[in-house]
Structures are given as structure tokens and as C-alpha cells.
Curated annotation (Swiss-Prot):
<dbReference type="GO" id="GO:0005634">
    <property type="term" value="C:nucleus"/>
</dbReference>
<comment type="subunit">
    <text>Component of the chromosomal passenger complex (CPC) composed of at least BIRC5/survivin, CDCA8/borealin, INCENP, AURKB or AURKC; predominantly independent AURKB- and AURKC-containing complexes exist. Associates with RACGAP1 during M phase. Interacts with SPDYC; this interaction may be required for proper localization of active, Thr-232-phosphorylated AURKB form during prometaphase and metaphase. Interacts with p53/TP53. Interacts (via the middle kinase domain) with NOC2L (via the N- and C-terminus domains). Interacts with CDCA1. Interacts with EVI5. Interacts with JTB. Interacts with NDC80.</text>
</comment>
<keyword id="KW-0808">Transferase</keyword>
<dbReference type="GO" id="GO:0000776">
    <property type="term" value="C:kinetochore"/>
</dbReference>
<keyword id="KW-0132">Cell division</keyword>
<dbReference type="Pfam" id="PF00069">
    <property type="entry name" value="Pkinase"/>
</dbReference>
<dbReference type="GO" id="GO:0051256">
    <property type="term" value="P:mitotic spindle midzone assembly"/>
</dbReference>
<dbReference type="GO" id="GO:0051233">
    <property type="term" value="C:spindle midzone"/>
</dbReference>
<comment type="function">
    <text>Serine/threonine-protein kinase component of the chromosomal passenger complex (CPC), a complex that acts as a key regulator of mitosis. The CPC complex has essential functions at the centromere in ensuring correct chromosome alignment and segregation and is required for chromatin-induced microtubule stabilization and spindle assembly. Involved in the bipolar attachment of spindle microtubules to kinetochores and is a key regulator for the onset of cytokinesis during mitosis. Required for central/midzone spindle assembly and cleavage furrow formation.</text>
</comment>
<dbReference type="GO" id="GO:0043687">
    <property type="term" value="P:post-translational protein modification"/>
</dbReference>
<dbReference type="GO" id="GO:0034644">
    <property type="term" value="P:cellular response to UV"/>
</dbReference>
<dbReference type="InterPro" id="IPR030616">
    <property type="entry name" value="Aur-like"/>
</dbReference>
<keyword id="KW-0158">Chromosome</keyword>
<keyword id="KW-0539">Nucleus</keyword>
<keyword id="KW-0418">Kinase</keyword>
<dbReference type="GO" id="GO:0044878">
    <property type="term" value="P:mitotic cytokinesis checkpoint signaling"/>
</dbReference>
<keyword id="KW-0547">Nucleotide-binding</keyword>
Length: 344
């Protein structure tokens, strides 16, 4: 069977992207830079734009010239060292042979995905991530597949997982934590404007770019929900909000809870409700049994308290996350350079 691109690897009906805001949040002054090599990766498709993820991302109306289209195969890439291993496959450093563009190539085994029954989760991850363009969201440039494997062409984040850096340093200081909070709030504002809830924000799902800038990855648990209301249990135990544990309908405010949990973990070194048993963790989350060690500054405590509210409607809105005095005082966010206007 020949390798294909831009048709889903399983017999699901195709869906078009739901309409959303095309502008980025106000604090992001420009889109993530698009290099000529990235344009090549994004534009190779066999169908019309706006159909399925992986198809033409950059429109001709933006001033970029037409690029000849053809499908990718594994032979288009030089495969380098492994970047990570998972239950369903591996991620490799790779280089596209013609453009020499460096990417992360995620190689997934169909047999494992089918065995675990997560075809829909993967399809959702591809469909959502392919339509997101923000400096703090890991890009999915394209994908293709063959009889045994599915290949996702992802942006390469040179500094790897935030989780690994946290393990090395044990905790982060105020400046680094506040910077991550601003980056995360900006990226989630963009996602929520497009009716996308991530639902699984945690250090393992956050990568770091060359300058240490945050990159949200792993949209496997995320959902494109036009109503922004769901009732599915998902996410990571220590990061689950009360409404999900209690089986209540939830909305985009679950991501606000996750920001609060993440901020605590970065400053303290462990999640706020971590306990010896799952039941005890559940109990502490539902009661919002929040305790701070003396090392956490009062400004950070106030920030976390305002996010970790049992009632979702009382949580600090995303717009106020970046505007919180503690974040404004300590954040040192660096925006990416301007994107090129056209391909030479």
C-alpha cells in the first residue's frame, strides 16, 4: 500500500474546521514565524484547503507563492536520534531532505493504536493541532501514513520537556514560573477563542523551544467543542478539577484549574493535592485542600488561590492571568522574531 497523506488512516467521516477567531490574543503581536522550509512542509497536499488537517495552512492570499504539491513519504526524511519513546511509538529528530528543515517526526504504530482503541483520540489530536498557529503551541506541519505506521511532522522543540527540566532543578524561580504562566495564558486564550479546550495541561505535555519559550504539545485529550461543555473524564489525576471528579459538566475553565496546579508544582516541586492514594487525592481536590509551604511568595499564593476555586465561574479569567500583579512583575516573556513576508 502506498503512503498517503491528508486522508484519515481509519474510516472516519471527514470534518471541516469549525469557525473561530482568526486573530491572536492582544499580547501576541504577531504569528509564529513561518520559514520557507516550513511552508514546504505545510503546503504538500492532494486536496483543496480547509478540508482536513495537514492540508494547505498558508493561503496564497497572504502573499506567498504557489509551491508544487506532492505527498510525503518516509523516504523524504533523514532520520536522526530518538527524542522520546511512548506506548504507541517513538519520536525522532529528522530532516526533510530537499529543504534541510529540521523537524520532530512522531512515528505511531497502527497496531498499538487499534489495540488500545484510541483511533478517535489520535484523529482528534491531528485535526485540532493542525489548525492551531501560535508561538506557544507546538506546530503540526503535516502527516502521512503507510500500511503499518502513522507519521506526524511536528515542530522540533530543542530543549525538550518542561518536566525534565523541572526534575533537574526541582523547582523554578518566580521569574521563570511567571513567564510560563503568561505564555500559557496567551496560548490558551487563542485555543479557547477557537473553541478548543486542552484538558491535560501538565509538565509532561509542555515543551521548550530554543530560547526556552513554552510550547503546548499533546492535544490527545483536547477537544474542539463548539458548545464548550463536556462531561468526559480525562486528563491527569493530580490536575483534575473538582467538576470532572464529581462527574459534572465542564467547560474551558478546566484549563484555568490546570494553570493553578501547574504554577504550584513549578514553585514547590510537586502538585498541590498529591497524596499517598488516589482516593485521598480526589478528596483533597474536591475540598480544595490547598496548603502552601513558606517558600511560596504571597503574590504567587494569591495568584494560585484565585485559579484553584471549586466553582469554575469564580476562577481567574485568562485575560486576568497575564494581568495579575505577580505575573506582570516577574514575567520576562520573549516574543519570536517577525515572520518573513514571502518565500525567496
Amino acid at each position: 500500500m502506498a503512503q498517503k497523506e491528508n486522508a484519515y488512516p481509519w474510516p472516519y467521516g471527514r470534518q471541516t474546521a469549525q469557525p473561530g477567531l482568526n486573530t491572536l490574543p492582544q499580547r501576541v503581536l504577531r504569528k509564529e514565524p513561518v520559514t520557507p522550509s516550513a511552508l514546504v512542509l505545510m503546503s504538500r497536499s492532494n486536496a483543496q484547503p480547509t478540508a482536513a488537517p495537514g492540508q494547505k495552512v498558508v493561503e496564497n492570499s497572504s502573499g506567498t507563492p504557489n509551491i508544487p504539491k506532492r505527498s510525503f513519504t518516509i523516504d523524504d526524511f533523514e532520520i536522526g536520534r530518538p527524542l522520546g519513546k511512548g506506548k504507541f511509538g517513538n519520536v525522532y529528530l529528522a530532516r526533510e531532505k530537499k529543504s534541510h528543515f529540521i523537524v520532530a517526526l512522531k512515528v505511531l504504530f497502527k497496531s498499538q493504536i487499534e489495540k488500545e482503541g484510541v483511533e478517535h483520540q489520535l484523529r482528534r489530536e491531528i485535526e485540532i493541532q493542525a489548525h492551531l498557529q501560535h508561538p506557544n503551541i507546538l506546530r503540526l506541519y503535516n502527516y502521512f501514513y503507510d500500511r503499518r505506521r502513522i507519521y506526524l511532522i511536528l515542530e522540533y522543540a530543542p530543549r525538550g520537556e518542561l518536566y525534565k527540566e523541572l526534575q533537574k532543578s526541582r523547582t523554578f524561580d518566580e521569574q521563570r514560573t511567571a513567564t510560563i504562566m503568561e505564555e500559557l495564558a496567551d496560548a490558551l486564550t487563542y485555543c479557547h477563542a477557537k473553541k478548543v479546550i486542552h484538558r491535560d495541561i501538565k509538565p509532561e505535555n509542555l515543551l521548550l523551544g530554543l530560547r526556552g519559550e513554552l510550547k503546548i504539545a499533546d492535544f490527545g485529550w483536547s477537544v474542539h467543542a463548539p458548545s464548550l461543555r463536556r462531561k468526559t473524564m480525562c486528563g491527569t489525576l493530580d490536575y483534575l478539577p473538582p467538576e470532572m471528579i464529581e462527574g459534572r459538566t465542564h467547560n474551558e475553565k478546566v484549563d484555568l484549574w490546570c494553570i493553578g496546579v501547574l504554577c504550584y508544582e513549578l514553585l514547590v516541586g510537586n502538585p498541590p493535592f498529591e497524596s499517598a492514594s488516589h482516593n485521598e487525592t480526589y478528596r483533597r481536590i474536591v475540598k480544595v485542600d490547598l496548603k502552601f509551604p513558606p517558600s511560596v511568595p504571597l503574590g504567587a499564593q494569591d495568584f494560585i488561590y484565585k485559579l484553584l476555586k471549586h466553582n469554575p465561574s469564580e476562577r481567574l479569567p485568562l485575560a486576568q492571568v497575564s494581568a495579575h500583579p505577580w505575573v506582570r512583575t516577574h514575567s520576562r516573556r520573549v516574543l519570536p522574531p517577525s515572520a518573513p513576508q514571502s518565500v525567496p
